[in-house]
Amino acid sequence: MCQDCKKTYYITTAIAYASGKPHIGNTYEIILADSIARYKREQGYDVFFQTGTDEHGQKIEEKAEAAGVTPQEFVDKAAAEIKRIWDLMNTSYDKFIRTTDQDHEAQVQKIFKKLYDQGDIYKGYYEGLYCTPCESFFTESQLVDGKCPDCGREVKPAKEEAYFFRMSKYAPRLIEYINEHPEFIQPVSRKNEMMNNFLLPGLQDLCVSRTTFSWGIPVDFDPKHVTYVWLDALTNYITGIGYDCDGSSTDQFKKYWPADLHLIGKDIIRFHTIYWPIFLMALDVPLPKQVFGHPWLLQGDGKMSKSKGNVLYADTLVDFFGVDAVRYFVLHEMPFDNDGVISWELMVERMNSDLANILGNLVNRTISMSNKYFDGVVSDKGACGEVDEDLKKVVLEEVKKADAKMEQLRVADAMTEIFNIFRRCNKYIDETTPWTLAKDESQKDRLATVLYNLTEAIAIGASLLYSFMPETSEKILAQIHTGKRELSRMDTFGLYPSGQRVTDKPEILFARMDIKEVLEKVEAMHGAEAAADRNQAGGEEGASGSAEDSGIDLEAKAEITYDDFAKLQFQVGEIIKCEAVPKSKKLLCSQVKIGSQVRQILSGIKAYYSPEEMVGKKVMVVTNLKPAKLAGMVSEGMILCAEDAEGSLALMTPEKSMPAGAEIC
């Protein structure tokens, strides 16, 4: 089919925030999107797959300052690292957009001006409760236990001149659209959440500019303002394919918009299903066809966090297991609408049972038997029976089931259907016992037919596997000397050419692993990382009183008894003075009042709090730690912090006012 005649399919991921190296939970989304994009190509669609990086905002400006570089230098490095991970995982994106791209920035300025000129944006003042890491204002009623509803950190009162978007103007229209298009927000649970928690109670006008930091896209007619994150970041989906609000959009935009699928994490679905469609309505641009809020990939029982020692990075996992194995783990373990769990133990189990045994051993055995009994030649002799017909039926049914699951974006279920093909093949070997047939010369045609059926089933399964594990698919097909079969031809069993020769040296696709050896290597790796952190603590970078920067790996340590825990003393401290540590990019030196004492404590939170912000705060302190020398200064305790999956820190503070020195129990 000619390229211009194909149906189009435009898929996007959320653009990754350029604040650091993405962990496997972040990487899951790009792998998921890649599997969908590849499958759509197999279905014959003209696919455009866009991903990229979100590179503006106060947090990046602060992190760049703490690192001693310009914001542009900081995001250049972060974007390169994110792109490296995406490429490592063999993702087939068509465009990697950066919000610092000149054409994107120019278009955002034009969009802002257009919305202002037509009265959708107006100038005013914003006074409310502000969360710096989330770069969001909230009302008192939106807080959860007095904290930011999105990240759980402290908010602080703020007032600033700002531009606002009239959200309420478009709310009735959006509600009507969602009701008329039930497929727009998926899964349905996300739709119900947006309707009941945000749209039906009523929308407030949205702040769309900031004046308290400069690292953003300037409002060209009022340059002391920079465009606020969501009006900048969300528009990448249209600017990346050539949208122009002046009416000069490119042919590419006209070809691919509206997007078929915005694939995003469940934590940002509000911005994509409320803010984004309303912006588009104001621009008179059609809405995307579907927004899918995928669940999180968790390590153990919680969201990944560096300070917990439970962050898994894609490149580390690739070193242990290989690219396709990691792709299999994250795609297979993620349910449709519930969080998935990943661990070293589970990955080794999947490696051994699914990849090495069910798939790898099947391919190796089949090729080896073809070489042993027929000098590598695979021929269909037509000596079939009832068991053969059942094999063929199951294989073709699983193809249909996998296809149906992919239409519903149930990728994990689709992979299960594919592996059911390989499971049925293994059962078929047990049923037909080729080694027994080989002993009887009269069963030679029967043996040949069995091996042909196995090879044909493997060819179908491997071709279907391509969207999820492309390298493995290609390796299998290369070993049986055939090309990838088109999805449209997988409704027929028996297309593998009779008389074809397979490789005489089958490659081991996946080697079995010993869980004990793997965990020992993991422990050694964590130990080396902790040692490196401790060594760094005495150097120019200093060290932190937070768990992350002290090299303390909470998840990696053995369980302790209650008596061990009881040895630690926690008290409320009040910070009465705070200064930046000279020549350190991370450290603040706080004088902390604890009862009648004042202690000096160093903390690696310079990127998140200014010395002025620290003064007066009540914090939680570990007070019976042995004093340590950090960056040439003595630290007499540890101020406790929490850390999110992006590596941002927030002080742990008592919910109610407590006197300095109060014991935490």
Where are each of the predicted segments found?
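Cys/His-rich short segments
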Residues: 118-171, 175
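Structured secondary-structure scaffolds
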Residues: 2-51, 103-107, 157-372, 414-418
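A glycine-rich helix N-cap at a beta->alpha junction
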Residues: 79-94
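Helix-rich, typically C-terminal accessory recognition domains appended to large enzymatic cores
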Residues: 123, 346-384, 394-502, 622
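Intrinsic disorder at enzyme termini
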Residues: 473-564
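Beta-strand segments within the central parallel beta-sheet cores of soluble alpha/beta enzyme folds
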Residues: 290-293, 477-479, 589
